[in-house]
């Protein structure tokens, strides 16, 4: 996706957010003239040479820094044009710098927590939690050296404050979930 911000005006008239969402992130001239983004069914993408492919894989694997403004596609499980478009439009919708789409809520929670926490740190979380999230925190993160402090009453400022004070020295993440599975 281009790094240029989406247009927010047409002439002097501000564009409605719906208009921005419909058109942002797709250049028909880069898609054989298709007015709307085609659905890409390819799982792999071509490089101009084996050397270009090898260099890109080195960047993707973290063995080499990415050149400024460089982007490319390797494998659809990493990224593909449709995913890039959805992420760009979600970022636009939320007024964010970027967005990440995952295949499940647990993938999103796991990615966010492992990216944000380090061994020796603490997570403060609401309780009860969805079972998968509870297992992630109580087992996987605990095995990784991350502690957890829960607060049982998400409506009580005092309960939340007490949990935050308990974890203050090592606290790094506050996780609040609502809408548990229906029993």
List each language-model region with its residue ranges.
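Glycine- and other small-residue-rich loops at beta-strand/loop junctions that grip anionic moieties
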Residues: 75-76, 101-102, 126-127, 149-153, ...
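Conserved N-terminal alpha-helix of the aminotransferase class I/II PLP-enzyme fold
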Residues: 44, 49-107, 132-139
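A glycine-rich helix N-cap at a beta->alpha junction
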Residues: 140-155
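Conserved PLP-anchoring active-site segment centered on the Schiff-base-forming lysine
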Residues: 115-132, 152
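Alpha-helix C-terminal capping segments
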Residues: 92-93, 111-119
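N-terminal glycine-rich, Lys/His-bearing helix-loop that initiates the first secondary-structure elements
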Residues: 1-69
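Active-site phosphate-binding strand-loop segment of PLP-dependent enzymes
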Residues: 153-183
């Amino acid at each position: 996706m281009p790094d240029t911000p989406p247009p927010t005006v047409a002439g002097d008239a501000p564009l409605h957010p719906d208009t921005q969402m419909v058109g942002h992130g797709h250049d028909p001239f880069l898609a054989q003239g298709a007015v709307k983004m085609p659905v890409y069914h390819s799982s792999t993408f071509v490089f101009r040479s084996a050397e270009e492919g090898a260099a890109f894989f080195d960047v993707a694997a973290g063995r080499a820094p990415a050149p400024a403004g460089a982007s490319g596609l390797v494998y659809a499980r990493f990224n593909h044009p449709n995913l890039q478009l959805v992420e760009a439009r979600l970022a636009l919708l939320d007024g964010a710098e970027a967005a990440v789409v995952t295949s499940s809520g647990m993938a999103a929670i796991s990615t966010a927590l492992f990216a944000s926490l380090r061994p020796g740190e603490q997570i403060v979380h609401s309780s009860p939690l969805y079972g998968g999230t509870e297992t992630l925190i109580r087992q996987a993160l605990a095995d990784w050296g991350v502690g957890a402090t829960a607060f049982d009453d998400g409506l009580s400022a005092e309960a939340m404050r007490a949990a935050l004070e308990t974890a203050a020295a090592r606290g790094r993440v506050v996780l609040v979930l609502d809408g548990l599975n229906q029993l």
